[in-house]
């Protein structure tokens, strides 16, 4: 089998094993990108040096680990070579707090956004705190206007959840639908007739372009708007347990990171000295 046939087999086997659609799409995108860059005609022609060189192209540790997992799983499922690249260590996770934008910086990005589709992307990521994979897989039927919620189906960990449908999104989504007439998925790729979904790389590029145009001099990464969304919710006084549910976190400890990266919270703390007459 060639690479394309192996990839199709990879997809079918992941479906058979009941992987979530987000995981299937994520791993498939990673594998396709990897083999495009490798320029090899068969998976067996890939060696450890090829993979190490490819992974070093990514500055983000999480991105490296994501591609590493996808490649490892591909060789396990398709070629039965579970330990083929066992000597390639995973990039070590760092404990640095994620970079977030201020509300003013987010506003600048919206102000310079003239493309309707790009504004929908930015709005959904920021208003709902969606993961990029969740936005890519979002269908029109998932948007429940009667209850003002968006249903996130088979999210990370194969769990469903709901997030709020912000009233400001309604007219924007209506305008978008009338202009693009997308059918199943809210976002379509470059060939709408084939109902191809948007790619995660395309969404990251949109965020990068908007931040650059807005003069935001901070590092842009895939989950930037998600982190901004929840950090700003914390600053607005939203209960951390509610944010945990919106984020789809299994533990509130994961959500607590947003209290650590919120600089505004510190300035809002009332010192007990405030009640003392000096």
What do the PLM-derived regions correspond to, one by one?
Residues 1-278:
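Conserved catalytic core of the tyrosine transesterase superfamily
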